[in-house]
Amino acid sequence: MSSLLSKTRRLNKILQKTGTEPVAFQDICTLLSEVLECNAYIVSKRGKVLGYTFSPGFECEAMKKKVIEDKKFPEDYNLTLLESNETLANLSNQGRCVFAEIGDCKTKDKISTIIPIIGSRERLGTLILARFGKEFTDDDLVLVEYSATIVGMEMLRALQEDLADQTRKKAVVQLAIGTLSYSELEAVEHIFEELNGNEGLLVASKIADKVGITRSVIVNALRKFESAGVIESRSLGMKGTYIRVLNEKLLDELKKIK
């Protein structure tokens, strides 16, 4: 069995999870690092580190700080990555650190390969590989470009799932608002003006006096929102009622009504 085939099959095992379970970017980085003996990084379009694995014995405090602590590459370096629309293989560091502010690199024989991650004709991120003293072969590049395609598909799926989730949350809020009477809607607007954020303490009697409505109107409005799952509330007795927004679309939709 060829080395490329065995490596590809190992990668495919990551993909053979349940259909609804997303492929972890970290798993792909770990596998690439193991089979290619390299550092592997998956970076979003905005430079956020989505997954990474360092090869054994890798010692670069500058890179570890960016990846582990900051979890983000510098903007200027990320812009350089985004300039490339095709694979750039076996780039020598020529004694310089990839981060301009660092200057000289302690490792003189570092070799990097940059692979764009593209989905639906849109740049989604970058797959970066780096190792020392040994160039990436054509078989290696076949594997990493295949990996970049997989990552692109997963990024698109994540974006689509997020869009669907946001749409669902918005629809739930709109339905909840639609169940309110005019006076209940007026009460809700004043409630969240008083909260001035996603959570806080509400004294229903104060709002009732201020708006000129009964306390029961406020209670009914809160019950409807709680039943819809857009807020949670907890009575604190004489202190009032603690309210927390569970659906972040609620405040946006209330602003639109105003």
From Swiss-Prot:
Keywords: Cytoplasm, DNA-binding, Repressor, Transcription, Transcription regulation. One of its GO terms (cellular component) is cytoplasm. Coiled coil: none annotated. One of its GO terms (molecular function) is DNA-binding transcription factor activity. It is found in: Cytoplasm. Residues 1-156 are annotated as: GAF domain. SUPFAM superfamilies: Winged helix' DNA-binding domain. GO terms for biological process: negative regulation of DNA-templated transcription. Residues 204-223 bind DNA. The keyword Secreted does not apply. The keyword Transcription regulation applies. It holds the Pfam family HTH_CodY. InterPro entries: CodY, GAF-like_dom_sf, GTP_trans_reg_CodY_C, Transc_reg_CodY_N, WH-like_DNA-bd_sf, WH_DNA-bd_sf. DNA-binding global transcriptional regulator which is involved in the adaptive response to starvation and acts by directly or indirectly controlling the expression of numerous genes in response to nutrient availability. During rapid exponential growth, CodY is highly active and represses genes whose products allow adaptation to nutrient depletion. NCBIfam families: codY_Gpos, PRK04158.1. Belongs to the CodY family. This is Global transcriptional regulator CodY.
